[in-house]
Amino acid sequence: MKRQYILAGVTTLFASLFISCSQEDVTDESFPQPAKEIVFDFEISRTRTITEGKKTFFSDGDQVGIFGLKRGTEEVLHDNLDYHYLASSKTWTAESSITFPIDGSDLNFYAYYPYVAGIRGVNFEFAVAQDQSEEDGYSRSDFLSAKNETSQVDDESITLSFVHQFARVEAEITVPQGEVIKSVDICAKKTAVIDLAKQSVTVKPDEAAEYITMQPAGERFRAVIPAQDTGKGKLFRITVESGATYWYKTVENIALPENEITVFSIDCTNPSF
């Protein structure tokens, strides 16, 4: 009986040690939940062009920059990540995926188009192309921005609805018979000061206006510029193939509002022109 008692005691001791060690191992080893990758749904508001039945679409190779800030703070967790569009698969891909923090914190998202490498933080300057006569110069000047400050960690996707933040100017031009328009330029400031968190876009006040070459689009010429009030004087410069130059002058300041199209009708055959 004594021998049996000792064996039972030893067996019990080893069993206790095994259970104790197993429990300690489980307690010490941590298994963090993986960070949840974020899926974005991008769309563009029709606000500016709805009256003409037009709509802006993202096209193959377009790039947007995205920032992720911890909600309630100014801490930037994702800084100007590059997302680009693949038309063949109708998908957006990124240089590195955006995830919610492991601690479950919510994020505010801010985005802009077109993407500019080297930007850090949600406050920066953006300048339109001085030559917008070709599609690339025009489209890469059309600044858009978006925000989402209501997303939750368990959302299946995050919607970012982009809005046109610049003014669009169009000019319908009539030149004397026999003349052919070579180029049309508008005198305006090129640079805007951006605050994505506030969705604020303002023209750089101390910048001098320059002539920006407009893009021919059907019977009109067009350009996108930061919203601004034009100064008095020579607003448009029209150059024709014969070498002659026509000027369209204003006698008062003209407002060019953001997210709107302002159309000018210019008749170069008018004797007073």
Residue ranges and their predicted role:
Residues 13-17:
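Sec-dependent N-terminal signal peptides of Gram-positive bacterial secreted proteins and lipoproteins
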Residues 2-8, 18-273:
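Sec-type signal peptide cleavage vicinity
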